[in-house]
């Protein structure tokens, strides 16, 4: 009977006897059904829980109806919260993370900023926190030493107290992720490091082809079929055009010291040679290329001499298609010679050493591949054509015998250089000290 009277004296579903909760329950009586019989124990439990809470918690609880709050209290009443594992900040566990985080002691500015921030935030609640921090920093820099002294003393006191509280404290700064990101960027940059060098070689190949376009055959391509590359920069073009005007002179201090790989047959070179090619000096090869007087044929000419330039249409001879057109009395339109291991001597005329005939190499087309026109008569005029068409003058700084290119040889050297007995040709970058003398056959006029 006493329990029933207590239940009647309290509003139904009320967790506490406060006026606010009573008024709330009275308002919500219409939509919240009264608790069934036997809920007096729930009401008492709600009173105990509600009395233990502070006012803010009660205000937050008013969002829910009284019956919901009673049910939650009933469920949570017998639960032992010490069994719940506390979450560790920062993810991965471990002995270090299990310890509670100890903050560093505040320095003088932090003491000032903390006290001033509280005061200013109370006075100017609309101030943004970042703007407040900027202003506090400016004010701190304007303070004199005497004005800073109380904050410095407080910071020192806090430091001493911190040392007493945590005698074995060591500051362990958190590792920033940005450092790892920068490290990975540098790794990727190291992986990409070798590629710009290869691109530079590629650009040089395209650029030297552009240099030869300034001759007779504007708009026609010289060189192997390569994929399109980035065009040369203006600086490189400006450096290439004055070289076209220098006909026979060698520029001693040329802007570019590395070898231009445009006309070197890269398939002939091994990977080790290509790897160390940048260290070579252009003028190192000059000892093998004497300028004056008759000279023995060079290994590069044995390669380059097999090419043939017919009229105004440049032809790149492919290695994969060997030619059998070696008859000395061939007539009709000229056919290009294909580069083989031993160039056929049949297409070259009976020339004295040192005075080659450039008839087949000049800009004009001739009826036969090499029609002998006397020792000096035809060669001088054709050499003038060569100079005018800038085949020889395009890159005078480089040794002509080293580059396999149509009509890219010095006029003082024989154009034909077959070797005896089909000897294996040494590579162009490592000439040996002794050569077999070339054999010249007589080509009779048909």
Curated annotation (Swiss-Prot):
Chain intervals with Gly residues compositional bias: 40-53
SMART domains recorded: HMG
Keyword terms: DNA-binding, Nucleus, Transcription, Transcription regulation
Motif (9aaTAD): 400-408
Subcellular location: Nucleus
Skewed-composition ranges (Low complexity): 362-378
GO biological process entries: adipose tissue development; astrocyte fate commitment; cell fate commitment; cell maturation; enteric nervous system development; fat cell differentiation; in utero embryonic development; male gonad development
Region (Transactivation domain (TAM)): 224-298
Role of this protein: Transcription factor that may play a role in central nervous system, limb and facial development. May be involved in male sex determination. Binds the consensus motif 5'-[AT][AT]CAA[AT]G-3'.
Protein name in the entry: Transcription factor SOX-8
Organism: Homo sapiens
Gene this protein is translated from: SOX8
